[in-house]
A protein has these predicted regions:
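Sensory beta-strand/linker motifs that couple input domains to effectors
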Residues: 137-148
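A short, aliphatic-rich beta-strand micro-motif
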Residues: 126-135
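Short regulatory/linker helices and ligand/cofactor-binding micro-motifs at input modules
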Residues: 21-37
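Juxtadomain coupling helices with adjacent low-complexity linkers
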Residues: 6-12, 16-19, 147-183
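Regulatory sensory and allosteric helical modules in signal-transduction proteins
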Residues: 25, 54, 60-68, 76-126
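Residue-level recognition of short loop/turn positions
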Residues: 99, 136-137
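Helix-loop-beta substructure at the N-terminus of cytosolic sensory domains
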Residues: 33-68
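PAS/LOV and related PAS-like sensory modules
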Residues: 1, 24-28, 183
């Protein structure tokens, strides 16, 4: 069951003081407002490498989180997940962004902070691995992530892989930024 504070936010949603600056930075980079086929392909790669049915490249601004890159395996169950846009207090990526560290949840129901989240209740997500996308300015823009509808052991290898994919994607983002500046 999902629980809300009187403010309408999920309980235990992290305070994100960097959201206003991140929103400006995402606009500068042209990220987080539209679907990006290159990022869809990158999400597909995340899913393949981590052998996960769902994967995404997620950017989080002041208003929402947006999966500019998203992959749903053809043989994965249709559960209403994943969606391109989610409220900031749904899912696990906002926690990765605020913590500035990767997060592995082998069974999300084992953690009170995450067990009552809407993506558990409404979409059946049971397992998550995500790593932050930290740019050259030290701003965490969003995440790369993979989820499963079954509990699973991502292990240290899965964590290392998510971090490596995040670093690779940050290099792509930097190359895009350099091309914009050279313009």
């Amino acid at each position: 069951m999902t629980y809300y504070e009187s403010t309408g936010h999920l309980l235990l949603t992290p305070v994100d003081r960097a959201a206003p600056a991140r929103t400006v930075r995402l606009r500068e980079l042209g990220l987080g407002e539209r679907v990006d086929t290159e990022l869809d392909a990158f999400a597909r790669r995340i899913a393949e490498v981590l052998a996960a049915p769902y994967a995404g490249v997620n950017f989080i601004n002041e208003e929402r989180q947006f999966f500019a890159g998203l992959h749903h395996a053809p043989d994965a169950p249709v559960s209403g997940y994943p969606a391109r846009a989610l409220p900031r207090d749904h899912g696990y990526c906002p926690h990765v962004v605020v913590r500035r560290r990767a997060l592995v949840l082998e069974d999300v129901r084992d953690f009170a902070r995450f067990a009552g989240n809407a993506v558990v209740d409404e979409s059946g997500v049971r397992s998550y691995v995500g790593a932050p996308l930290t740019d050259r300015q030290g701003m965490v823009l969003g995440t790369v992530c993979a989820v499963d509808l079954e509990p699973r052991r991502w292990g240290t290898q899965g964590l290392a892989t998510a971090k490596s994919l995040a670093a690779e994607l940050v290099e792509i983002i930097h190359a895009r930024e350099d091309a914009l500046r050279a313009g």
